[in-house]
């Protein structure tokens, strides 16, 4: 084959890959398309009656309190009582951060009760109380912890955030097998919020510190302005309910009649961000939504009833698992799914460790140019 023809074919193949990346499934084109959803949304439904949620066994009401500014980002991690190794891996890695880009970050683990028939239920209960006392990051509600109760778990967490952490600017809901690049996520939220808010480095001391006191440090000052609505994640489009008997994703025709068609667009439950105002809106209309056991679908349905549409973000991995790669995890990805405790800590080492410092760039110049495309190719080859 002549060299010139080979180069043309290579260039054509590269262009096709770039076009697929931009406008294929979960590409930047899809992110732009999601911006048009707001104009297609129905009028918001009127608020429904208050939600009937299970009582909190470990309420942890003061988790967002304490000295200093309120959390900029509250992270709610859905976990199971027996998943202690996953929780400890998160605490020892990205969940150990209490500040990112100068703003406070708070993490809480959401869980229910061990199954009544579980042979180790009572020891689990005792261990959870001890863990909660030692760590201060547990939020437990009185329901049987199972996949089909994820909606109860998530709503309990969002309701807690609205009541006891209402000053948090954003809430991330995620799972205990998901790696979160907290510094990059905070930077992403600052960039997206920059259209409506002003973020400044200032020398304004906290109220408890007298003017002229040199003991306080320069910190970003968040001006008090109205929060815009934000529902950000890996958006799923035109998903039809599964009718497969016995499937954990099964939705009956009574729960979602065939005449309703596909689900409205919703963000993958592996990781989505809601502004505080979006949380309030969803809680107001959630009691009018059909009681679906799939929490990410339920949140999407509730958001739509409130007139809120999800915004697609290509950096949120959804259900995709990305193999460990310093450039992808440190620069381009905000989340990655299906990481066991060992991989969780290895990923944290790749992106800088507990101090967040690094001596070399995350990516070479070529990796920077290829960007998220390279990460997707790696994930595809790995799968």
From Swiss-Prot:
EC number assigned by the record? 2.4.1.62
- What subcellular compartments does it reside in? Golgi apparatus membrane
Record topological domains on the Lumenal side: 30-383
Name the InterPro entries for this protein. Glyco_trans_31
* Gene name of the record: B3GALT4
Catalysed reaction equations from the record: a ganglioside GM2 (d18:1(4E)) + UDP-alpha-D-galactose = a ganglioside GM1 (d18:1(4E)) + UDP + H(+); a ganglioside GM2 + UDP-alpha-D-galactose = a ganglioside GM1 + UDP + H(+); a ganglioside GD2 (d18:1(4E)) + UDP-alpha-D-galactose = a ganglioside GD1b (d18:1(4E)) + UDP + H(+); a ganglioside GA2 (d18:1(4E)) + UDP-alpha-D-galactose = a ganglioside GA1 (d18:1(4E)) + UDP + H(+)
Q: Which domain of life is it from?
A: Eukaryota
This protein's name = Beta-1,3-galactosyltransferase 4
Q: What is the lineage of its organism?
A: Eukaryota, Metazoa, Chordata, Craniata, Vertebrata
Signal peptide per UniProt: none
| Transmembrane stretches, start-end | 9-29
Q: Which GO terms describe its cellular component?
A: Golgi membrane
């Amino acid at each position: 084959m002549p060299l010139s023809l080979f180069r043309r074919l290579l260039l054509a193949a590269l262009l096709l890959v770039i076009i697929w990346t931009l406008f294929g499934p979960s590409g930047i084109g899809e992110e732009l398309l999601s911006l048009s959803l707001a104009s297609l949304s129905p009028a918001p439904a009127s608020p429904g009656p208050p939600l009937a949620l299970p009582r909190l066994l470990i309420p942890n009401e003061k988790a967002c309190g304490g000295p200093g500014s309120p959390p900029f980002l509250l992270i709610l991690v859905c976990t199971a009582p027996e998943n202690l190794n996953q929780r400890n891996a998160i605490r020892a890695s990205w969940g150990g951060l209490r500040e990112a880009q100068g703003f406070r970050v708070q993490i809480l683990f959401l869980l229910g009760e061990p199954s009544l028939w579980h042979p180790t239920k009572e020891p689990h209960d005792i261990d959870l109380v001890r863990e909660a006392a030692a760590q201060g990051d547990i939020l437990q509600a009185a329901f049987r912890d199972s996949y089909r109760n994820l909606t109860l778990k998530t709503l309990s967490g969002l309701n807690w955030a609205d009541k006891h952490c209402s000053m948090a600017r954003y809430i991330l809901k995620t799972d205990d097998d998901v790696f979160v690049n907290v510094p990059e996520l905070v930077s992403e939220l600052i960039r997206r919020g920059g259209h409506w808010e002003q973020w400044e480095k200032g020398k304004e001391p906290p109220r408890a510190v007298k003017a002229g006191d040199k003991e306080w440090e320069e910190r970003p000052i968040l001006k008090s302005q109205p929060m815009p609505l934000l529902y950000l994640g890996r958006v799923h489009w035109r998903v039809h309910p599964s009718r497969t008997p016995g499937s954990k994703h099964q939705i009956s025709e009574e729960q979602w009649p065939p005449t309703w068609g596909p689900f409205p667009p919703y963000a993958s439950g592996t990781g989505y961000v809601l502004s505080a105002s979006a949380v309030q809106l969803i809680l107001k209309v959630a009691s009018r939504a059909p009681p679906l056991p799939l929490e990410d679908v339920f949140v999407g349905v509730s958001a739509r009833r409130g007139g809120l549409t999800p915004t697609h973000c290509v950096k949120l991995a959804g259900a995709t698992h990305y193999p460990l790669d310093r450039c992808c995890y440190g620069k381009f990805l905000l989340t990655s799914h299906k990481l066991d405790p060992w991989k969780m800590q290895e990923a944290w080492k790749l992106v800088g460790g507990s101090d967040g410092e690094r001596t070399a760039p995350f990516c070479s110049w070529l990796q920077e140019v290829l960007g998220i495309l390279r990460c997707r190719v790696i994930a595809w080859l790995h799968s």
